[in-house]
Amino acid sequence: MDDSIINLISGILILLGFAGVILPALPGAPLALIGILVFKLFSGDCSFGWEVIIIAGLFVIIGAILDYVLPVALTKKFGGTKYGVWGSIIGLIVGFFFPPIGFIIGPFVGALLGELLFAKKDMNLALKSAFGSFVGFLVTTGFDLILCLVLFGLFIWDIFIN
């Protein structure tokens, strides 16, 4: 297959990875990694070694683990109960149907409602644990975004500069 077609497919996968950082239906950083892997395997334009793919893969795995662990851990660290954690998860799922703002505020609102309605916490404590959920979301989203930017940068560097 022609390198330009492979490069186009790789670029589309990487761009879909960026979309996946915001849209929960798409696996963001893993899609970008697949784009880089396709580029490495099938394009004659690729000059970086397998160690780059392996390191990127390790960061994708770390990011995937953080996506599930960090929001829950920070919700608990900020005083959240299991109701806040479950509310955050449900808020994330509900927020999926109202992109992109729903994905951003869904976990926060879910954690807040979980704490208020089921844990019977006052507004200040509920807001604190919901804030923990929101901070976890921001950190993991930022990590995935930076990872996708690095992978995109590698791709662009190899095609246009190298």
Question: Residues of each region from the PLM?
Answer:
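Membrane-interfacial helix-loop-helix
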Residues: 1-5, 41-90, 116-141
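Transmembrane alpha-helix interface/packing and boundary motifs in multi-pass membrane proteins
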Residues: 14-31, 91-101
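Hydrophobic alpha-helical transmembrane segments in multi-pass membrane proteins
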Residues: 20, 93-104, 140-151
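Interfacial segments of multi-pass membrane proteins
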Residues: 31-48, 90-98, 109-118
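Hydrophobic/aromatic residues in alpha-helical transmembrane segments
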Residues: 34, 70-71, 109, 152
